[in-house]
């Protein structure tokens, strides 16, 4: 895949750089190209850190990179500060009582109210936990404390890293932002930031999109804007660009308005009406705010002749300990035909070492887990044996969730959603995905606050060639219509200039 002129500029720009990347602009491809180039050009012993929010996103970056990344850090925000700052240097600041094995547990049962209580939990239980208030971030507060007070930590980071790349920066909270800017401004580690405040769908859990905007105005950062949406057709681009001030200038009127369908309909007729505009031979997705509405919507659409598969949240998705990746990998081994022991090893958070002995042992243990599927206790024992072999701890309640995920076939679709032509899913789960056709409900987005606007932007920009907006007669849907009209009016445009209401 070739680079566009703006992508070339980004790849070739040195120094601190912030990129505002609208939906569908090839952000990951650009970042991976930049990382590859800068690793290849590096002539020092130093390495890079590529940091993102999920293990899945980190794995995608690893898979796309054509260079050897064995020495480099590619992982999640939390794993970066835990492995590179907290575990090795906490004892420097807090004393030898904290020179111990630590694991994470962000579950509800492990949460605490104060910084001191969280520190005490590490000392007594060896557990890195989180706050009851999900808008506060203990892990990054602790990392900040350590890096500011430990000379050895600062020297280590400066000596090890020549560049840090941070993905999805709009989802960073205040504590993350403070630490990343400390690494950049105080430790002088070159920093690449990419994000888009229009796509901040995690404000409810502490995401602080203003952090991204503040970097945009920093004098020590070069700024670049990626606005060319290679995913969506022109009409859908126009619609999404009008939602935000920064992209309104990209709006350009067109004559053909057949790619967006606005359906004013009823709760009983909506599914049959929608299917008049959906091509059953092209992939489509119903995106809803709640899992319940996605499930019910899939049922109604299926009853009207097009089979929609509801993609549920699996029981193991709720697990937040540092063993979570392993439960997911075991489930994939037993559910996905082509997922192997090698794939599991590649997902080990610390770089997997594919020795023949390791692969053989993991294959043997996975076989034992598979053979125990009809014996719940045997399944728990076999899974625990693999976890212990890899240095991870299990919990009884989590083993139960894994067993349920694997034995209840309704959850299997969640591991291979791309296999299905038509799916129903929450728009939070759709981030990073794309579909030829997308169905959304007006009532899910009142457009009266930043969060609602971001959610709507993310949902509509999943669509390539067709967007169906279902407008029922209720308060939230009416708010959506009124607020959308106000937003479009800022550009001197009416809703009817952008789409046809049916």
Model regions and ranges:
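The feature marks helicase ATPase cores and/or their adjacent C-terminal helical subdomains
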Residues: 1-502
